Amino acid sequence: EIQMCNDDPGWRIFFNTLQGLFHHHPVKIDIAGTIESIAQITPELLYRCYHTFYNLHNMVLSVAGNCKVDEVVALADKLLKPCEDMQLECIFPEEPMEIVRAETVETAPIGTTMFVLGYKCKPASGLENLKKELLATLALKVLTHVTSPLYQGMLKDGLINETFSTEIFNGDDFFVAMLEGESKDPHAVRERIFAAVEDAAKNGLDETLFENSRKNAYGSLIMKFNNVEAVANLMINSAMSGIAPFDTVTMLSSLTIEDANRWLREE
């Protein structure tokens, strides 16, 4: 299972990017671990991990739909077994803001060269992390919108295709803004993006595009409340992140172009 991803170019380039950005943070390690680390697992270690992390006091139950709270609680009390109250604390190694290396190149027999450009940003938590995530998402959407000079210029010159996209990858003590896709000349794409980011940091983002993107994101978020599964996911993700379920709606409605420009300059 660990080795089967070694010939997946998307998987390889993703972790190559993380390993180029992070010195110590475990996010750079393949989620399945390594062959060496798996070999060290014993039955005792496995049971210890199970009883420590798969613990009711370390879990959140999220229920959405046509149900009654009292009935759900009664059923949970009947089926769930009492366990030791264990308070867990995740301790991450100190991570410098400097990157490990500016470029990683891996050769593989694929039809088109793939690239990921990752910006290592300052991590945050709670509401601050939510605000940063929303601002970063909007800023990248404005910069790379299909009508933006950056996107149109790269598309016209054949530097990108329909696979070009952006992503915010963040979690406990890490935050990365990513731009990715396929290109015959990834270095030219990198220089175009660098120039566009520098110009936006100096002169500001397109305000009309920002407002349109913000309103579009707001509308999409509101529509999710019609989906029962999406509501359940929202509640559990909010609980795990230390925020309230409606904080995203409130935060998104209050963001301004000045907030986005400030994030772009500082991050």
Predicted feature locations:
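Long, positively charged, glycine-interspersed low-complexity recognition regions
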Residues: 115-117
